[in-house]
Every structure is written in structure tokens, then in C-alpha cells.
């Protein structure tokens, strides 16, 4: 899932004028930095979000767009579907040949 998110972030960077390498590097570094900060501090992701947003700022504008697009709901659904599929494969259903 994270690779898809990094790719989409990089595509967004290219869309607003960055070259592909810069966009990919910035996207990957953003994800890496956030993950490291969460692991090192033990902070809740919501706390990290609050730390990096300011009223009317760029981060909150991007977060609002993600929420409007249903990213939270979509990620939860992806985990649920993957879990269901894993259980199906564990039972050896006839659909496992399509995986």
C-alpha cells in the first residue's frame, strides 16, 4: 500500500511541476521521515499530524483533500479486503488460483 501512496505523491509532485526524480525522492523521504518520527517518539499519528499542521497552511490543505477523497475509509477497506482474501487463501478456496 505504501509504495502505491509514494507513487501517487510523486505523481502529484510531477503534476505541479517537479521533475520525476525530485518528486519521487521527496515523496519517499516524506513517508520515511513520518514513519521514523512515529517509531522514535511513540506518538499517535494524530499527534504528529497536529505537530505539522498550521491554520491555513499547506499540510492542512493537503490533509483536507485526502479526507474529502475518502483516503482513510479506502485504506481501512483495503486492509479488510486483504484480510478476507488471506483467510480465503488459508482455507484453500477455489478462487485461490486467481491470486
Located regions from the model:
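Anionic-ligand binding region
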Residues: 1-25
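NAD(P)-dependent Rossmann-like dehydrogenase/reductase catalytic/cofactor-binding core
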Residues: 24-99
